[in-house]
């Protein structure tokens, strides 16, 4: 019997994925460590205070730039997700009991780190009556109460599209409300079986209607075509998405979806230009871009674009 690292039995899909060896990365999938004073100070602070960020724990290649800008990302809700996406390295299983003190601790970490901009993401909590809506909203409120000058970006699951859950989250007032579509309609069910493409677009529309700046992400290299990417970008813009990031899929382990292709840097430039032509207020595209990369800068760009459009 094959088992995953966390001890559970492998799904048939994971067994099939594992038959494809881990792919060798092309030469452009690399980053240079530019270690500046802000990064060094934050690194020492995080180690000294025993703080936890997605940036370090996920080995993000952009940590040097983001920490130099005093930006960081936090994961809430535990380390077990009730859903399984075929690209995601977070384990699927039964989550621990809800930790109602977590919002305070995250807010304390933001203050201790002196962050200018904080991104908060988390696992899906379908085991909870509200799907975890309180936790997401409470974390934003706690950060803002303790750090009034810090921008907050909230990356959420879909909460099954339930209006009351979404409204609770929206009312917490993050600077940016993000929900990642991640892939194109044709392969969506294969990649994100617990989500639906249209429901994800609906979350973004609801956030826009609530007056929030909205954001989403597309991962390339999962089997989509270039035409499908352009169509998905159009769908996102039509849904009211203000900011989009476009990234290269990097396979976390052999049990995850194989990399179908390595998208060349010049293709990312073309997709970025196409997205800008559609009217997105903020666009970042590249092999090592991640959805929270330069999040604060993208928010400022989108806010300025909105202000100009309203004149």
Curated annotation (Swiss-Prot):
PROSITE patterns the UniProt entry points to: RADICAL_SAM
An example Gene Ontology molecular-function term: 4 iron, 4 sulfur cluster binding
Superkingdom as given in the UniProt entry: Bacteria
Biochemical pathway: Protein modification; protein lipoylation via endogenous pathway; protein N(6)-(lipoyl)lysine from octanoyl-[acyl-carrier-protein]: step 2/2
Top EC category: transferase
CDD domains, per the entry: Radical_SAM
Keywords, sorted A to Z: 4Fe-4S, Cytoplasm, Iron, Iron-sulfur, Metal-binding, S-adenosyl-L-methionine, Transferase
Record note on cofactor: Binds 2 [4Fe-4S] clusters per subunit. One cluster is coordinated with 3 cysteines and an exchangeable S-adenosyl-L-methionine.
An example Gene Ontology CC term for this record: cytoplasm
InterPro entries linked to this entry: Aldolase_TIM (IPR013785), Elp3/MiaA/NifB-like_rSAM (IPR006638), LIAS_N (IPR031691), Lipoyl_synth (IPR003698), rSAM (IPR007197)
Pfam families: LIAS_N (PF16881), Radical_SAM (PF04055)
Assigned EC number: 2.8.1.8
UniProt domain Radical SAM core: residue ranges: 67-281
TM segment ranges: none
Sequence positions that bind [4Fe-4S] cluster 2: 81, 85, 88
The reaction(s) this protein catalyses: [[Fe-S] cluster scaffold protein carrying a second [4Fe-4S](2+) cluster] + N(6)-octanoyl-L-lysyl-[protein] + 2 oxidized [2Fe-2S]-[ferredoxin] + 2 S-adenosyl-L-methionine + 4 H(+) = [[Fe-S] cluster scaffold protein] + N(6)-[(R)-dihydrolipoyl]-L-lysyl-[protein] + 4 Fe(3+) + 2 hydrogen sulfide + 2 5'-deoxyadenosine + 2 L-methionine + 2 reduced [2Fe-2S]-[ferredoxin]
Assembly notes: Forms a complex with GcvH, the H protein of the glycine cleavage system. The strength of association is dependent on the presence of S-adenosyl-L-methionine.
HAMAP family for this protein: Lipoyl_synth (MF_00206)
Similarity comment: family membership: Belongs to the radical SAM superfamily. Lipoyl synthase family.
Name the UniProt record assigns to this protein: Lipoyl synthase
The gene coding this protein: lipA
């Amino acid at each position: 019997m094959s088992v995953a690292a966390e001890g559970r039995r492998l799904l048939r899909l994971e067994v099939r994925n594992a038959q494809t060896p881990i792919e060798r990365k092309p030469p452009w999938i690399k980053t240079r460590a530019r270690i500046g004073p802000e990064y060094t100070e934050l690194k020492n602070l995080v180690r000294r205070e025993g703080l936890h960020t997605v940036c370090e724990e996920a080995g993000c290649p952009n940590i040097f730039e983001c920490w130099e800008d005093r930006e960081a990302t936090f994961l809430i809700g535990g380390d077990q997700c009730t859903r399984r996406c075929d690209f995601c390295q977070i384990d699927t299983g039964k989550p621990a009991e809800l930790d109602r003190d977590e919002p305070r601790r995250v807010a304390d970490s933001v203050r201790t780190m002196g962050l200018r901009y904080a991104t908060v993401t988390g696992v899906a909590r379908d085991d909870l009556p509200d799907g975890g809506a309180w936790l997401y909203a409470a974390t934003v409120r706690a950060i803002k109460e303790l750090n009034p000058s810090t921008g907050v970006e909230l990356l959420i699951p879909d909460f099954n599209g339930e209006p009351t859950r979404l409204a609770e989250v929206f009312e917490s007032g993050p600077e940016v409300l993000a929900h990642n579509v991640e892939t194109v309609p044709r392969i969506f069910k294969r990649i994100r079986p617990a989500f639906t493409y249209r429901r994800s677009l609906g979350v973004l529309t609801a956030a826009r209607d609530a007056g929030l700046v909205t954001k989403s992400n597309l991962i390339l290299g999962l089997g989509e075509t270039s035409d499908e990417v352009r169509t998905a970008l159009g769908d996102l813009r039509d849904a009211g998405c203000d900011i989009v990031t476009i990234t290269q899929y990097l396979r976390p382990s052999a049990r995850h979806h194989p990399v179908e292709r390595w998208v060349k840097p010049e293709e990312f430039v073309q997709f970025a230009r196409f997205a800008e032509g559609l009217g997105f207020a903020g666009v970042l595209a590249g092999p090592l871009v991640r959805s929270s990369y330069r999040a604060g800068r993208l928010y400022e760009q989108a806010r300025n674009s909105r202000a100009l459009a309203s004149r």
